[in-house]
């Protein structure tokens, strides 16, 4: 979640300081791709009114809420079997990939897979090919370069 210092933090939407007399909040760091339209919201302090007035404010709220729900332990259910994944070493996490609902990657946002079920997952090859294409494109920019995508690709490769 964004760290907010009242009287010092600045809302990125209006460039005004966040004060005690305004409703404010912060987004979690939910968007890893700097080229995504919602990246500016990720890990940012904001005025609530500014988010509500922003053209993509509702969309940012929706994806941030989905991210928070996704990270809860009780929601870590394998997309192949529906069973809860309880051990970290068995857990493959596919987080936020894109806000572009027309992208074939969109349907893979916020998914959990038990490592033992990877070979049974019908969409494994499709996701792998999409991630490899994304890695080679200019559409993905991460502060750790391609490491984030490389780690995800490695985790879903048998």
What positions do the PLM features span?
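Polybasic, low-complexity binding patches
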Residues: 54-85, 124-140
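Residue-level marker of intrinsically disordered, low-complexity segments enriched
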Residues: 2-4, 16, 44, 92, ...
